[in-house]
Design a protein with these regions (language model features):
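C-terminal lobe and pocket-closing loops
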Residues: 9, 19, 106-134
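Well-formed, non-transmembrane alpha-helical positions, independent of function
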Residues: 13, 37, 89-90, 108-109, ...
Length: 134
């Protein structure tokens, strides 16, 4: 006889293991260095700006940004990857202009000089990254 569990009712979370806010990334040679410069780039370009994304939540961050800027959807093109690491590889390779992925995925590449951190999609500063624009 099989035991049927309704996991949503049978288990309770006991700890938050990890939290990694989303971050906006660019190739180190990009002229964009801050969220404000990214906004100006999106508004000024005649063609869509490409964002490599590795998940649905990442796409929502880009959609939220464009809605706040009150720009049409044709100003930004999101390119879906199988995951955030693959998305960042194409930014580092110069194939895609920008990316939105968790900060924990991209920051080691910043330390290696292969990626530029433009800003964080967070309401509060992150420990160790207090100088990064929000």
């Amino acid at each position: 006889m099989a035991i049927l569990l309704q996991t949503i009712f049978e288990f309770e979370p006991i700890a938050n293991i990890a939290k990694s806010p989303l971050a906006f990334w660019a190739h180190p040679s990009s002229k964009v260095n801050t969220p404000e410069e990214l906004i100006n780039e999106i508004k000024a370009k005649q063609r869509p700006i490409n964002f490599a994304i590795g998940g649905g939540g990442h796409k929502l961050a880009v959609e939220y940004l464009t809605s706040k800027l009150n720009v049409s959807g044709d100003k930004v093109e999101t390119i879906m990857y199988k995951g955030p690491a693959q998305a960042l590889l194409d930014v580092m390779g110069g194939h895609v202009e920008f990316s939105v992925t968790p900060v924990a995925v991209g920051y080691p590449y910043v330390q290696a000089g292969k990626l530029k951190l433009i800003g964080l999609a967070s309401e509060v500063p992150i420990h160790g990254l207090e100088k990064v624009p929000l």
